[in-house]
UniProtKB/Swiss-Prot annotation:
GO MF annotation terms: DNA binding; zinc ion binding
Motif HCFC1-binding motif (HBM), residue range(s) on this chain: 122-125
Gene this chain is encoded by: Thap2
Domain of life: Eukaryota
Record's protein name: THAP domain-containing protein 2
Amino acid sequence: MPTNCAAAGCAATYNKHINISFHRFPLDPKRRKEWVRLVRRKNFVPGKHTFLCSKHFEASCFDLTGQTRRLKMDAVPTIFDFCTHIKSLKLKSRNLLKTNNSFPPTGPCNLKLNGSQQVLLEHSYAFRNPMEAKKRIIKLEKEIASLRKKMKTCLQRERRATRRWIKATCFVKSLEASNMLPKGISEQILPTALSNLPLEDLKSLEQDQQDKTVPIL
């Protein structure tokens, strides 16, 4: 005979002196699957000795024509107190947490740690184990070093571009002062032409202008 009910949170146990009957899960795969779905137990697989008690069925689900209480062929369990079961699980979880917190910490707590070790301890809860956290830290340190290198390269390029612009501006101004370029032309051409002119081209232009002896009138 069955010993207890398989429904979550149900404490019904077989006793011939109480008016509760127990019923096996259907053998028909479709009906059996529907029962399992309604029971709503995670990873639940009923066996041949798995039962539900009569408290989970409506009165219309029973065939009372004989001497024993039997379920009709289309009967499905629809009466469950899931709220009580969830509250019970939460209560057990809180009690377990209180029990774990009641144990005093063991081992020395005043060890001096370096920066990487401190970060490892503070954030190791996000990883499965400390070694995984340490590998993650090493990877992040490499990424930071790579970004710093790229930043340094960008700054160097920016400084070179600034120096090139200053040299180009001074060169055009000198040509303008020596009447090799019309007055005021620098304000027109510098913002557009010289910004994209390579330094090598400026040097070539400077050499060409030095070879000229006749100024522009």
